[in-house]
Amino acid sequence: QKHTLSDLIQRYIRDVLPRKAKVYVEYASQLKWWEEQIGDVRLSDLSTSLITEKRDLLSRTITNRKKQMSPARVNRYMAALSTALNTSIREWEWMEDNPMRKISKLKEPRGRVRYLSDEERERLLDACKDSANTNLYLIVVLALSTGARQQEIWDLRWSDVNLIKGLITFSETKNDEFRSVPLKGHPLKLLLEHSRIRRDDSDIVFPSKKNPAVSYDFRNPWKKALVVAEVEDFRWHDLRHSCASYLAMNGVQMRTIAEILGHKTLSMVQRYTHLNAEHLSDVISDMNNKMFGNRS
């Protein structure tokens, strides 16, 4: 009962965060904000209303980019604190209940869906193939065919690739869960060819030329390829949107798309449902034309 929120946060950063390398910097920064705001509050006095008050303060914060903090970012601050509180309940028995359990997440606007048209895709793939960077074409093909996140594909290791079964297992994922995606056809052929010239001193599929212990940074060749291909308003993450969009337009069920992308819930793939509906509309139209086209 004597522990304060500051005690909890400091212990969490010291003992737990080192095991969460991918979120260490982000979580530490977010938790320190909470410590600055209400770190001296005893855990026994930590209330839902107090946290809500600070959440609303956070939502009015102006960022370094001179913009009000987005609901999504506020929700990440809330998630960091809630995770730490849950750890104190389960593992340390410092608290009996999480006061954040009753607090709703801020409503986030639906994210944009930017995907490549057929013409854009062909231009971009041609530009990547002609790039001075000999690996750019392969990594873009892999991104489009697997829907993997940028770091998942950039940090891919040979130990996570089964060329015989045609399977990639992403182990360094955003939600710390393993995910396997089949690799077939052209992408598998390209990766097989690439495996024949892999470096002996690195398990990384796309290692840096200067330091094989780290992954290659594709930002510059990627930007140049976009310019050459005349593809505008397109980010690397949109390759992931493109993969999901193509799956939806080919009639793949939302649950399957979620599994391929590594989403725990269907809510993150609902943005693609209209594409699936458009595809189904075309299918029904074609079927009706074939069945009834000659009838007056």
Which residues make up each language-model segment?
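C-terminal secondary-structure termini that scaffold catalytic or DNA-interacting sites
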Residues: 193-197, 207-212, 267, 285-296
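Catalytic-site neighborhood detector that most strongly recognizes the C-terminal catalytic loop/helix
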Residues: 115, 172-176, 186-188, 261-286
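Active-site/catalytic core of tyrosine-dependent DNA strand-transfer enzymes
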Residues: 184-232
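Short, polar N-cap/turn motifs at the start of nucleic acid-interacting alpha helices
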Residues: 160-167, 233, 252-271, 282
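C-terminal catalytic core of tyrosine-transesterase DNA break-rejoin enzymes
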Residues: 90, 141, 145-152, 221-224, ...
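Short basic/aromatic active-site micro-motif
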Residues: 46, 135-136, 232-250
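Basic, Lys/Arg- and aromatic-enriched nucleic-acid-binding interface segment
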Residues: 68-71, 75-79, 90, 94-150, ...
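N-terminal DNA-binding module of tyrosine recombinases/phage integrases
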Residues: 1-53, 57
